[in-house]
């Protein structure tokens, strides 16, 4: 499996409205300069760069491009000020009940430990080099399917952590980068404002080391988990991309014969 093929597969097996986004950190200036993607010519919040990439935009970013102080802190492109580190900053805005809780949020967030000279943010399918992180923002159903694909090879997902704050920069990017494991986010008010995510969208961050097995896991769990209506769409998308659709089996699910009483009935 290669990157382009993996994107074709995931976009066939999931009905995505946005393309998966790849994030690559550069710690060598010469390598960053040689990476043939235009550098952003003005500031942008990191989360909005991810949103733009999910719609096809590719860009490189340095600390001068950072339009959000919290995103820059997560990416080690700005020092964490003492009021943020000790919890007083967020407590002053009435986000948390007391100083202990507020400080615990800062203590438990995992930011980059080394400052990158730059970052590439672009559609995953554009990469030839391996990115560090893959981000998918979609509806809860598709994120469920990604987690099921992860579970196929990895079992129960026990590490998911989120608090509705620093959703794209920390939940999906730096936490995933540090732990080398997947994480989800329900997003946060800040990114929903500046990146204009839809109300029904949530996200998942995936380390590249797990990407191919997750794609394969989504494929392998299609027949037990997807219903006939969704299978029809998958089959159609596979064929449109010239991919093999012969493994799609209808009228077959993991819970066949498990339920009594049928679906809930509603009266008009």
Residue ranges of predicted features:
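Acidic, serine/proline-rich low-complexity intrinsically disordered regions
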Residues: 3-268
């Amino acid at each position: 499996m290669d990157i382009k093929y993996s994107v074709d597969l995931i976009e066939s097996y999931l009905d995505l409205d946005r393309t998966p986004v790849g994030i690559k950190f550069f710690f060598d200036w010469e390598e960053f300069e040689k990476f043939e993607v235009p550098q952003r010519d003005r500031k942008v919040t990191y989360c909005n760069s991810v949103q733009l990439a999910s719609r096809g935009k590719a860009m490189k970013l340095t600390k001068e491009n950072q339009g959000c102080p919290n995103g820059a802190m997560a990416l080690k492109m700005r020092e964490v000020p003492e009021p943020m580190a000790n919890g007083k900053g967020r407590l002053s805005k009435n986000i948390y009940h007391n100083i202990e809780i507020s400080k615990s949020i800062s203590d438990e967030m995992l930011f980059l430990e080394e400052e990158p000279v730059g970052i590439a943010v672009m559609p995953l399918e554009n990469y030839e080099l391996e990115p560090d992180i893959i981000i998918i923002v979609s509806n809860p159903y598709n994120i469920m399917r990604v987690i099921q694909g992860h579970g196929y090879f990895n079992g129960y997902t026990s590490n998911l952590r989120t608090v509705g704050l620093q959703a794209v920069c920390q939940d999906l990017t730096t936490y995933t980068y540090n732990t080398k494991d997947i994480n989800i986010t329900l997003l946060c008010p800040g990114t929903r404002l500046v990146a204009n995510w839809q109300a029904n969208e949530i996200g998942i961050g995936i380390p590249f080391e797990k990407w191919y097995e997750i794609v394969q896991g989504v494929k392998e769990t299609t027949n037990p988990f997807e219903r006939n209506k969704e299978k029809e769409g998958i089959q159609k998308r596979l064929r449109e991309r010239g991919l093999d659709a012969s493994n799609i089996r209808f009228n077959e699910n993991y819970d066949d014969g498990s339920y009594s009483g049928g679906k809930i009935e509603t009266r008009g």
